[in-house]
Amino acid sequence: MYAVFQSGGKQHRVAEGQIVRLEKLNVETGATIDFNEVLMVAVGDTFKVGAPFVEGGKVVAEVVAHGRGEKVTIVKFRRRKHHRKQAGHRQWFTEVKITGISA
């Protein structure tokens, strides 16, 4: 059994017991979250596809940790002009463990 749900403007394909990194959520570690924006649920060979969401579909997850991803370096320069600009960015994320899928 797996499901596709939407969180933080992105779609995630998950199964029970899987740990997934999502965009940062303002929820404490150890809390339980319900995702109601379920786009598809698959059980064996049968599929339920929503238009846009599956009616009664829910993905339940437990927050495992919060953190920051690896640094992405941005470099901009103009040739022959002695101009160079460098910056870095680390995106915040929330790790969740999928505890239940229902449709």
Curated annotation (Swiss-Prot):
The keyword Amino-acid biosynthesis does not apply. It comes from the Bacteria. GO terms for cellular component: cytoplasm; ribonucleoprotein complex; ribosome. GO terms for biological process: translation. The keyword rRNA-binding applies. Keywords: Ribonucleoprotein, Ribosomal protein, RNA-binding, rRNA-binding. SUPFAM superfamilies: L21p-like. It holds the Pfam family Ribosomal_L21p. InterPro entries: bL21-like, bL21-like_sf, Ribosomal_bL21, Ribosomal_bL21_CS. One of its GO terms (molecular function) is structural constituent of ribosome. PANTHER family: 50S RIBOSOMAL PROTEIN L21 (PTHR21349), LARGE RIBOSOMAL SUBUNIT PROTEIN BL21M (PTHR21349:SF0). This protein binds to 23S rRNA in the presence of protein L20. Part of the 50S ribosomal subunit. Contacts protein L20. Belongs to the bacterial ribosomal protein bL21 family. This is Large ribosomal subunit protein bL21. It comes from Aeromonas salmonicida (strain A449). The lineage of its organism: Bacteria, Pseudomonadati, Pseudomonadota, Gammaproteobacteria, Aeromonadales. The gene is rplU.
